Structures are given as C-alpha cells and as structure tokens.
C-alpha cells in the first residue's frame, strides 16, 4: 500500500466497552508492552457436542447473545468436569453464568435442552490485541485525545510521520507502537523540516524514531516497481491516485515531456501504456533511480531519461525531438504455449506485430514541482517560433497540453484559488488565461483550461494541477 492511516477496522479505544479498553498510564515515556495486559471476567456457553457449535453459534448470534468486540474470536476451548476439551462461545458482557436473570430466552432454552452449559471464562487481553489507536489513547494526555496522530505515509518498509509539536514528547512511543502494529514496517522516521528546506531536490531532513536505519525501499505503483534511497529522492505515496489520473489522459503512441520527473511515477507507468516519454530530473540520484526503473519495468523503448535543469530541458527537448532520428518501437505478440507440453500454440491467422512511431512533437508537458513549477513556464514563449507551418491549421498537429502542478492558499471560495493560479500562469507565459477559459466556460475555449484539485496539504495549502493547451501566441512568439 502507498499511504496509510491506522487500520480502518481499528476502532479508537473510546469506542470499545470500558472493560475491554487497555490499562491507562499517561506517565509512560518508554514503551512497556508488558503493562498492557488485563483479565476480563466473562461467561461462556460450553457446547456439549462439538459438532453442534455452528448451529448454536448461529442461534446465539441471532438472539444477540454473543460477545461482539472487534478482533475477538468468540469461539474458545474450555475443559469440562472430566477434563475433556469442549468448544465454548463467549457471551456478551452483561450475561452472568450464575445469574439466570441475565439470561435471554434463547440461552435458557439451549440450557434446558442440554445443548449448552454456562461457565465462567477469564478472557486475557494483552498488547498484541489492542490497536495502535487503543494503545496510544491510553498514554497520551486526555486533552490530546480528540485528534490522536494517525495520518502517516508509507513508502516500502518505511513509515514517514509528520508529527505536530504537541506530540513530539511522545514521538518514540508513537513510532514503536506503529512499527509493532504494522508488520511490513521496519523503519519509522519523522520529518523535522519542510520538504526542500535544505535541498533543491525536494528531500527533507528527518530523524529515526524506531527500527532499522535503512531507507533503501522497494515501492510499487501502477504495476511498476521502483527501488530507491528515500532519503535522497522525492516520493509521495499520497499522489498515486493523481499519477494514475494524469497518465490515463495520455493515449498510446503520444509523446510526453516530463520536465520534473523524479524517479518516474508518471513516466514509467506511461511507458507501460506504450506512451513515449522524455523524462528529466535535476537530481543525479533521481536520474539513476529512473534509469533503473526504466530497465526494471522494461520500458526502454518508450521512456528516455535525462539529467538537466528543467527550464533548459523544456527549450532544448522541443528542438532536439524535432531534429533527432526517427524511432520506431516494434512490439511482437507474445507466443502462446500449451500449459502442459510447453509447445508453441499455432494461431491462425498469426497476430501482427504492433509498431509505434515516436512523434516529433510533444503532445503533453508534465511539470510536477508544485512549489515552483509555474516559474518554469517562462521557457515556453517562442518554443516553436518559425515553425507555425508544422502545426494546425496547416497540419493536423496541435500544440501541446501543459499540466503544471502548484500550490494555492485553500480559500473558502475555490474560484479565488483558480484566479490566483491563472494570474501566476499568465505572468510567466505572457498571455492572459482566466478561469472562464475552462472547458465549457464563457471564455477562450481554445485554451481548454481545467484546474484539478489534487489534495489538501495543510489547512491553508491546497495542491492543484492546472492543464491548458499552449496558446499559439506563446508557442510562436518571436523572442
């Protein structure tokens, strides 16, 4: 999984009946797992015939007499008076084995028919039973329980926290419990400063809170595998849905320029869809990881990596693509073989190979550096100056779509954010774009503007993706 919170079926301890909640120790600063242990006195219905357990369970479930506590199996083993092991069913906490007044008509009926016998049962609960939310709620101060820290990002075996200041005194406790409760996690880190505060490569300073000091991860996304040192590249698991959304806008055989490609979360999945991509990133380690991902996911024919400055890459790549030698990728159909013999299965008629010819113009530009990507738009004016005859209306070739990621202030009225984004884009490309230019709006429909709300980064910070067709006045401008 790519991002996570506490397990969806893990209720907060306040949702459990009092008698099933863990012991409380709000002075704990070093995790003591042995402290979290308690015995809960219950009653159980011992079933005389083990073969009758399913029927009795169904009847007691229907009468709502069974114990209903998340993650607890109500079927238990008990010994009868002769020492024989029998199956028993734990009953709801209000039922008392020695008080018939607490028995339902169904329990009384089953006892009278000799199908069950009422027995006391001491249920032992320990640290392994309770969830992260249960345990941490028994440690944090009561005034911090309204919003316990349980939003995290998982990258491979690493859990990445971004703890608020009030939880820092408990950071090691939080990390240890999270590692215990998520078996695939081996390392827990906490971001100590904002992304990019110390590096132009969008990495961030962190502290190790629990587990191994090993950030070499294996990450899967869109059926692709990426291997990288999480401390040296940018990766955000919360963006998988957005990566998928944009890649789905690209068509087979199209040409994409991924200007700030990172390790390739757009480029490599696009290559798998038989989309040509020139993918660039300034980070040398990110470039190396992208090279590995291209090879590992077998998209060498479609994805070409570069290690350049983004602004330089925008201008250079447009000219280079137009002048470089043509490329054709041939995909031969897979040979079908008989499962038993392994022999080749003849197909009539035999399927033809697929051929994909790399375009000489980009159909899409992707600019996924939300903090500063809009600033790089000033590389587009004049990008195809003097090449007007190669584009519509003279040919069928349209100017490219630009997909630029950015942050805005998360206004109460989203239109204010859209106005802000359009103004910033307009300033950089020297051409006015307004929210009315959106598809179906009252403005300039040739712009094909759409502004997609990607995610809320913080209460006052929203991430957007603005997509628009590069205006002819910009592309052909003489500069």
UniProtKB/Swiss-Prot annotation:
A Gene Ontology cellular-component term: cytoplasm
Q: Which positions bind S-adenosyl-L-methionine? A: 243, 281-282, 309-310, 368
Q: How does it assemble?
A: Monomer.
Q: What is this protein called?
A: tRNA (guanine(37)-N(1))-methyltransferase
Q: Which gene encodes it?
A: trm5
Keyword annotations for this protein, in alphabetical order, are: Cytoplasm, Methyltransferase, Mitochondrion, Nucleus, S-adenosyl-L-methionine, Transferase, tRNA processing
Enzyme Commission number(s) of this protein: 2.1.1.228
Does the record carry Kinase as a key word? no
Respond yes or no to whether keyword Cytoplasm is given for this record.
yes
Q: What InterPro entries does this protein's entry cite?
A: MeTrfase_TRM5/TYW2, SAM-dependent_MTases_sf, TRM5-TYW2-like_MTfase, TRM5/TYW2-like_N, tRNA_Gua_MeTrfase_euk
Function text: Specifically methylates the N1 position of guanosine-37 in various cytoplasmic and mitochondrial tRNAs. Methylation is not dependent on the nature of the nucleoside 5' of the target nucleoside. This is the first step in the biosynthesis of wybutosine (yW), a modified base adjacent to the anticodon of tRNAs and required for accurate decoding.
């Amino acid at each position: 999984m790519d991002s996570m919170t506490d397990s969806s079926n893990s209720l907060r301890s306040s949702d459990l009946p009092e008698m099933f909640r863990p012991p409380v120790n709000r002075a704990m600063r070093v995790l003591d797992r042995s402290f979290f242990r308690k015995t809960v006195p219950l009653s159980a219905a011992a079933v005389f015939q083990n073969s009758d357990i399913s029927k009795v369970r169904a009847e007691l479930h229907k009468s709502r007499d069974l114990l209903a506590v998340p993650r607890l199996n109500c079927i238990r083993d008990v010994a009868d008076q002769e020492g024989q092991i029998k199956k028993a069913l734990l009953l709801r906490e209000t039922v008392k084995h020695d008080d018939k007044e607490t028995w339902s008509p169904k329990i009384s009926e089953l006892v009278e028919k000799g199908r069950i016998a009422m027995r006391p049962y001491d249920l032992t609960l320990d640290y392994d039973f309770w969830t992260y939310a249960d345990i941490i709620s028994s440690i944090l101060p009561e005034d911090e329980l309204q919003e316990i820290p349980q939003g995290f990002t998982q990258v491979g075996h690493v859990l990445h926290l971004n703890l608020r200041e009030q939880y820092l005194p408990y950071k090691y406790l939080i990390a240890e419990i999270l590692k215990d409760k998520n078996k695939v996690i081996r390392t827990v880190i906490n971001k100590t400063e904002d992304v990019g505060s110390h590096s132009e490569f969008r990495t961030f300073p962190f502290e190790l809170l629990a587990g191994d000091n090993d950030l070499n991860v294996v990450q899967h996304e869109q059926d692709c595998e990426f291997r990288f040192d999480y401390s040296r590249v940018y990766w955000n698991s919360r963006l998988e849905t957005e990566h998928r959304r944009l890649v789905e806008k690209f068509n087979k055989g199209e040409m994409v320029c991924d200007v700030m490609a990172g390790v390739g979360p757009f480029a490599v999945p696009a290559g798998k869809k038989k989309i040509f991509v020139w993918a660039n990133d300034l980070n040398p380690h990110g470039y190396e990881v992208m090279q590995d991902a291209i090879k590992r996911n077998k998209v060498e024919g479609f994805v070409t990596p570069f290690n350049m400055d983004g602004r330089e890459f925008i201008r250079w790549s447009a000219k280079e693509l137009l002048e470089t030698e043509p490329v054709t990728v041939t995909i031969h159909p897979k040979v079908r073989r008989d499962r038993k013999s392994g022999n080749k299965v003849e197909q009539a008629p035999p399927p033809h190979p697929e051929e994909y010819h790399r375009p000489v113009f980009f159909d899409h530009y992707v600019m996924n550096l939300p903090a500063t990507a809009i600033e790089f738009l000033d590389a587009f004016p004049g990008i195809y100056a003097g090449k007007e005859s190669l584009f519509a209306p003279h040919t069928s070739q349209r100017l490219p779509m630009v997909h630029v990621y950015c942050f805005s202030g998360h206004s109460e009225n989203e239109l204010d954010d859209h106005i802000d984004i359009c103004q910033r884009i307009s300033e950089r490309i020297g051409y006015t774009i307004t929210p009315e230019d959106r598809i179906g709006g009252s403005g300039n429909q040739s712009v094909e503007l759409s502004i997609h709300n990607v995610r809320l980064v913080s209460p006052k910070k929203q991430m957007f993706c603005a997509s628009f067709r590069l205006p002819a006045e910009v592309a052909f401008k003489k500069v």
